[in-house]
Amino acid sequence: MLNPGAEVNYKWHVGIPLLSHIHASAGASGVSVYDLFADNGVNFNEKLRRAVYNLDRNDYFTINQQLEIISGGFAYGNSYEPNKYLSFGLYQELDAHVYYPKDYAILAYKGNRDNIGRVFDLSDLNGKAELISVLHVGITTKLNKKWTYGFRGKIYSSLLNFKSTNNKGSFVTTEGANNFYNHNFDLDLEFQTSGLASLVDLDNDGQNDWNAKAVKELRKRVLFGGNLGLGLDFGFTYHPKEQWTVTGSVQDLGFIYHTKDVETYTLKGQYTFEGVNPLFPNNGSGQTADEYWQEITDNFEDLFQLDTITKNYVAWRSPKLNGSASYKYGKKVLKECNCTADDSDYLNEVGLQLFAIGRSRRPQFSVSAFYYRRLFSFLSGKITYTADGFSKTNVGIGLSSHIGNVNFYIMADNLFEYQNLAKANYASLQLGFNYIFPMEKK
């Protein structure tokens, strides 16, 4: 979504349904597919070991996808020069962010045999994912030549939600008294879901139609059919001088209140498991091996009581902060007089952009430098360099064209890695088609 306080210089616009904005991105900090599967003579087990131990608990994996379903807007206000713009639309978003559960990974990879006495931190499990639709209406107001500000209200409808961010506890193996080892659990784990239980319970009549039924059910939740929430975006644009521009915005300052189809799974308590005694063939009990191991399984399951509750919960959106400062220069020179056109815009722009998004453990930051150039009257381009938690060598490129009243834009990141995407820690692509009706020149 754009800054709601961005300047708008057209009379009205309408997005081509399902094509006005398409965005997809995925990233993993600290590791790439190439690190695990490169044909470089290193054994896969060694590559896996390096990944398990080298990644930090603050490393993360993220996926984001957006699809604008409908969008539009129009200018209004002063009949001579409208100074307000009303925008509206509906879009779908998938967002998932999971921290690397380091102690869980080490325990799964190495087991506890070589980690006697080590305390495994169970709070390493931290992540959330959501599939939502967003209905929004915004108003942008141009106060004067220097200041423009705007607000956008949002109604969220949650299709699916998963959340596990407040886990606590530990696991440690020590030498035992009645057996070789004691396994000590101190558990306070919670996994919250909404929209999932009804999908799992969908009837399957044996014709492999579960997927079709699930899609149909999710479609019902797109507009006011799921758990609802409210959000707010606000932003501004300021020109301290003619060629300088400063912008700022806060987006998705909001929440979703989950009351429908809610299930929360909890595992709490302190437990000690002393392992099993060996089974000897002539123990005189008459118990078979299968019966013995079933008893062990039952005892272990009784030790851990997984509770399922249907308590309402609030899921806060991940707020986003954007800021930029830029400088424009180089007006078009007219051949007829070898002078600049007074009513033309600048051809070049350079600047810095800052982005931050709130996450459950700590914010995620990125900073970008960019150069913008109007190549032709109908085509402009933009080159960016971004440093963030994924990479320090992220170079992106974007193009925007205006042919007639149709605008098309496309932008991609991490161009240097496109020859082998497996090496990339992050990749993103966005594009869109919109119909724009310009202001009449006075």
Please annotate each region the language model reported.
Residues 1-442:
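Subset of outer-membrane beta-barrel
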